[in-house]
Amino acid sequence: LLCVFVYGCGVIDKRPSPVYFGGEIVNPTSPYLVLFKDDQVIDSAKLDRSNRFKINFMAESEGLYHFDHSPQFHYVYLEKGDSLNLRLNTLEFDESIVFSGKGEEINNFIVELFLANEEDERIVDQYFQLEPDIFDEKIESIRQEKLAQLSTLLKEVSLSPRVTALINATIDYNAF
């Protein structure tokens, strides 16, 4: 009975599952988009006449991937069964990224977190002149704000423990 329960929860399901990653690149700087997991190429796609691409692959596991549209790249979190669309404009690469489809919530959150971290870097530079205790309070305030945003997201959508841990680690890393 325990085996049926564990199998039913997907804990031991190691079978690959299809993932779709596609979208549109406005003002492309390269004719290709390349998808990586760690440093390994998963697949590449040539942009069509409408600057659209699509990649279908069998995912062994969920995780952090990145796509490269030279000379830029960005991260994307893909899980088994995702069907994720991307739209971006290379003139404002990071600021224009929008995801839609299955997996959009976490990926749009990752983009927002990335952009917020860029902004925080400019703000934190001003804090270096403060006393250590006040500096720590300001940094902790920024961290708590991001954790509150994650908490709100978790109330709206169900995220895997792995991606939740990744986001928590990202928030903590950028606070220290």
Feature locations, PLM:
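Sec-dependent signal peptide recognition
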Residues: 1-2
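C-terminal motif of bacterial Sec signal peptides marking the signal peptidase cleavage site
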Residues: 5-8
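A non-transmembrane, solvent-exposed segment enriched in polar/low-complexity residues
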Residues: 10-166, 170
